[in-house]
Amino acid sequence: MADFKIVVSDPKTKTYQFDITGAEANQFIGRSIGQTVDGATVGLDGYTLTITGGTDNSGFVMSPTLPGPRRQKVLIANGVGYSAVAKGVRRRKFLRGSEVAPDITQINTKVTGYSDKAIEEILGGGSEEVEAPAE
């Protein structure tokens, strides 16, 4: 069974993190960067999420340019996972493929389709009033 941390970034407000396991997690396996997922898998009914990246259990980032789910050592000059310190410098780095596999730990997503309800309302924290602490 796969366990994922799903990071949902809402461009309008802020970022939320969900832990999913079991059947919900299996819906992400085999999906690639750029594909859409129903938000109901993380409890956000009516929302549409797009996979933007992620990291595996060793911390290697997923690259949208590499096909498949495996880890590869590639020569890169700039892009996901490496920023060159000078022009023309290239380096051999480990990167993960763009496909979600069971050994991925974190999946980054962004909201592309919105529901009538705000995410705060769905999660139950939108209408609460916080009292000032007693002095």
UniProtKB/Swiss-Prot annotation:
Transmembrane segments: none annotated. One of its GO terms (biological process) is translation. Disulfide bonds: none annotated. It comes from the Archaea. GO terms for cellular component: ribonucleoprotein complex; ribosome. Keywords: Ribonucleoprotein, Ribosomal protein. One of its GO terms (molecular function) is structural constituent of ribosome. InterPro entries: Ribosomal_eS6 (IPR001377), Ribosomal_eS6_arc (IPR020924), Ribosomal_eS6_CS (IPR018282). Coiled coil: none annotated. The keyword Ribosomal protein applies. The keyword Cytoplasm does not apply. Belongs to the eukaryotic ribosomal protein eS6 family. PANTHER family: 40S RIBOSOMAL PROTEIN S6 (PTHR11502). This is Small ribosomal subunit protein eS6. It comes from Methanococcoides burtonii (strain DSM 6242 / NBRC 107633 / OCM 468 / ACE-M). The lineage of its organism: Archaea, Methanobacteriati, Methanobacteriota, Stenosarchaea group, Methanomicrobia.
